[in-house]
Structure formats: C-alpha cells, structure tokens
Amino acid sequence: MAEQKLLVKREGDFHYPIYLKNDFQDLVGAIREEGLENRKICIVTDSHVAPLYHEAVKSALQEISSEIFSFVFEAGEKNKNLNTVQELYKTLIENEMDRKGLLVALGGGVVGDLTGFGASTYLRGIDFIQVPTTLLAQVDSSVGGKTGVDFLQYKNMVGAFHQPRLVYMNMSTLQSLPNREFTCGMGEILKTGLICDEEFFRFVCKNQPEISKLDLSMLSRMIRRCCEIKAGVVERDPKEQGERALLNLGHTVGHAVEKLKNFQLLHGQCVGVGLIAAAYLSMQRGLLTGEEYEEIRKGCHSYNLPLSVDSLNAGDVLAATKKDKKMEAGHIKFILMDGIGKSFIDKTVTDEELLQAIREILV
C-alpha cells in the first residue's frame, strides 16, 4: 500500500496535513515538519486505547520532547462531557501546561472531540494533533475542526471549531478494532458516498468482502477518498454556513435515536439508521426510486448496520429531533437525497413526513 499525505487548506485561515501510514514510526517526523517539536506534550487517550498504543506513541514522542505526561479517562460516550473536560483542565494546570503546549488526541471520536474542545478552551486555545485509531475517527471526526462534548445527553451540544495542526493515521490500528467499531465507521463511509459520490458508494458496496477483511489496500483507498471529500467540504465551508451541513445526512434521526437509546448504540450505527430514514423520506418525495432505496438498505445491511431499532416511540424520536443543534429558526435543516450521490439541504420537511420516516426504522 502506498503511504499517502493530503493537505487541508483554507487561504488565510488554516492548513494542516493528513498522513495515512501503517505504523507510528513517522509520527515524530510529521510533528517536526509542522514545527511542533520541543514542546510540553499531554497525550489524551481512554482506557480502551491506552493499553494498546499509549506506550508506543509516548516512546516515539520522547525523541522530540523531554516533558510528556498523559490524561487517561474511562472509555465511552457517557464520559464525553464537561466533567471529564474539567479533569483534563486540572491535569494540564497541575503539569503547568502553557500556551506553547501540545495536546495529542490518541483514540477514537470521543477522544478526538473531547481533546479538541479542551485544546480550544484551555488558555483560550492551544495546539493539538489528532492521532485517530478507529475507522470512524479516521474517515470523519478527526478532520475538519469540529470539537465538543455532550450536555444533558444532547450530542455535541457544547463545542467549538478548532482545527488540528496535523492528523496522523496509523491504519494498522484498525486490525485491533472490534467488529462493532468497524461497523460504526462504515456508517459514516456510506454516508459520505451518498452525499456526493455515487461511484464511491457503489465501490464500497461492491467490495464489502475485501473491506470487511481489513484489506489494507482497500482500506487505504476508502479512507483516502473519505478524507478527500471531507477536506474539500471543510475548505469551502469550515464553520457550516452552507455546504458542510450536507455531512449531517442521517444525523438528525441518528442523533435522536442515539440519545433515546442512552448511547447503547454507537454513533455510526445510529447514522446508519438515520440514513434509512432519510432515504425513505427522499423516496416518498419521489427523489429516490424504490430500487435506489433498496440499494441503500442492502449496502447498510451488508456491513451489519442496523436497519431498525426497537423499544422507541415515534413521537419521542420526533420530539428529540426538535432539540437538534442543527435547527434554524424553528425548522429542521434536513438532508435529503436526490438520487444516490446527490444531496441537498431542505427546511420544508413536515412533522408528518418525518414521523412516517421514523416509523419506517422502528420495530
């Protein structure tokens, strides 16, 4: 597999590289290239990732820093909150971290979101880098500068835009990924194709056997394309004033389900269910054919994404969508599909339309 590097750049605003590698050997070189050496470093990770990769990363970083400490919190979405951020602040203060310090987010989406938010707010903003170790984090959450934590069980309700200084992906970490976490990442990958790349969506569906076997060549191609799409959107619309909202396809219903299931389902699994609801609503409006709707269902099913959820009430799901942070002037900014690989923002979705789509994914 050819190792690769992409650049995320917006003139006069930000620029940073995305490295796609097979190990951690070049992490130090990447940090040096960005001029981030000789700083105090805090590695932020969780209880799942720390036993796997913390020592390898810390050992590598000792080449460029004589002051390294760590903050390890209990893994899980339930700990992506302000209480954990406060504990991070305490650790940074106790270790006399100053504005020249560097946070290293080592882990999945929860670690990246929380670390980024901590970096954006500590001393009014310090540098951080993303070292994502899950498929979802590599293809989605580590790129783009969205940071945040959950509040009162509302997903990412408190957050800030704060771009990382670099993103370093060691794709061999996916070999240790539990099947459920792999499935979670595939929800975001299928979403990416449905938004703007029909050919990519069909590539992912067609090559499911090789991708599910974690073929590094296939994974590299798939992850790179997702990063290219995400980087392009972020460069054009970094703060979600327009086009970037398309990346929320499947997320309105998905976030509602995630909250009501008390985060028992992983984010990408809920996005998968949300994709089915969005596809159904699009079909009901005549934007998707019945065949395209079934193709989307089949693609999700092939990667073991849930097509429905149980023990929920349609009215409760609808009410939860009303508290979504993507509301604008009392209207939901719902993302619909106009065929596979084409999407648009719609503010005219009625409660009855949404209820019909929600009922489609409830059992």
Positions of predicted regions on the chain:
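Short glycine/serine/threonine-rich phosphate/pyrophosphate-binding segments
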Residues: 110-117, 138-139, 256
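A glycine/threonine-rich phosphate-anchoring loop and its flanking beta-alpha core
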Residues: 11, 117-210
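C-terminal charged capping/lid subdomain of soluble metabolic enzymes
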Residues: 2-6, 187-189, 287-363
